[in-house]
Amino acid sequence: MDKAAIFHRPESEMGYLTKQNKYCVRLRTRHGDFARIRVIYGAPCAEALRNIEGNTWAFDQLEMTKYLVNGEFDYWEALLPVSSKHRIKYAFRLLDATDGEYLYGENALKIFNLQNVARMRGFITPYLNKYGQKISNDWAQKTVWYRVMPDRFANGDETSDPEGADDWNNDPMKDSLFGGDLQGIIDHLDHLQRLGFNGLYLTPVFSAYSGHKFDTIDFFQVDKNFGTKETLKKLVEAAHNRGMHVMMDICCDHLSDFSLEWQDVRHYSERSSYAKWFLIDKYPVRYVPSDIPDYAKMLTYEAVDDNPHQPRLNFENAEVQDMFSNVFRYWTRNFGIDAWCLNNADELPDSFKQRLKDELRVLDPSVMLVSKGRFKANDGSENVLDAVFSNSYSCEIVDAFTKGDVTPIDLSDSQVQTASKRRSSAIPCDILEFDAPDTIRLIDACGGNEELLRSLLAFSFMQIQAPCFLYGTEDLLSVKAEEKDENSGEQPLLNAIQSPSLQPTMKWEKEKQNVTMTRFVSHLTAIRRKYSEILTKGSFEWGQCSNKTGFITFTRRLGKQQLFCCFNLGYGSIRIVTPKNAKLLLSQNLMEKDSRLGKQGFVIVEM
């Protein structure tokens, strides 16, 4: 028995109040150490009822289920009824394969007996009421996201084009502006609807200098090259009329150096009204430029990744928090924004995020706040907002399919680790994103291999989290990684970070569209939406996984309904046998007569 592997953290993803007014408790143990585990629980005040005859704390017992398993750990779960007192004391009764019994409470692991139960310091919940429940965004669990960079998607209003706009078919440069706009998105909403997407995810639309708009100048204005506030409102209404929800990107940790606030600081130094809005080490604010425009040395102020054009904001300042509170409430109240993606949310104070969530819930109880972090794992670090981008798991999936650095067994372990760090009700709202404005394209990560891309996408659509497409994936839109010196001996990284300005424009000519891929995406989204209940609420059970031959199997199960999935990541074909009564939903490189699944093949069947 590995005592160090036994772990429980109360008031976290391992102990929380559910929407069904139950208290979910979880326990982690070393794989195979215990045959059964029970939760012993009761009211904390029951201890006071002991009498001189030696009666101990009155408790009930509930069997735990093993809800996650990998090669390293077993994860156990039970749902405790919340008593009329709204407080629970609990501990764990562990039974090993040799009938040994142990008691795990707050202070230690001991032999299970009534004497130790009487002396035990158990885990005690705070007062449990509905305020402690995480609101589940039911609409988000059924959403398939499509991410759009307005400047690169479609030009629907040439009157708003920037001066000197690039030709739409030119290769992008770091300072490119192509003239895509909000009207262009409106014009092509039917395209997204035909593909089956019901979530529109917009990169920033606020006033900014660049084409990608992550360098915001004014959070209260729509960028003039994208259109007007009226156009944005028209876009949101048009999306809603098609059953789509709209999520907006926002970067709260910095402003552009073109912003009025920063220009005021540059001019007046410490006498500026905004001096305390930023993290300034020394006045006047200055830096030493380098050969790279977005990197500087010897800055006298804090900037994102030493980019002198993105001075960091001071979120300890109440005025900064008030400004952003007004920003979120303004766009949510007046434009009907359904969700917000907070970039670099792991660098924002939890107190501000809680305030933001409370304020927006008053305007719209179903609004969703999503954390996209930079430095934390993203799979368990966010305790305040509604959902996260499961970036670490996304990277594991891409590496497993495209590089082979992650083995099938490693991938299954990663999925279990990701699920263990999140509340069950939160995972279906979390987002799996494989390429983004600051990465190369997924088709490029796949080396241009369409079959590999389709296999990876099919795998992602069978996960619990909501899948997210970057515009143009359905047409194999490609952008090459920045080339390195041929004599350096280094290869470009498949997941290399690069400027969002290098993302290509969408190709709308019919001859440039990929009919096969478009049809495949439509099938995927149809399956995801038809089987949303089993995919978001059902269990995820790993089957056989082989590092030697490179195949993965798993089952998604909800009641009597089952989806069986098999993916071949190896170099040769594998033998596969599906039940006669199974309904084939989607496959690739399946040789039914020979009962074999070819290289980069997959099969998804309903049992």
Regions found by a protein language model. Name each.
Residues 31, 593-607:
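C-terminal beta-strand-rich structural cap/linker in extracellular carbohydrate-active enzymes
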Residues 143, 149-198, 205-329, 334, ...:
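Substrate-binding/active-site clefts of carbohydrate-active enzymes
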Residues 1-33, 116-131, 136:
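Non-catalytic, glycine-rich low-complexity segments
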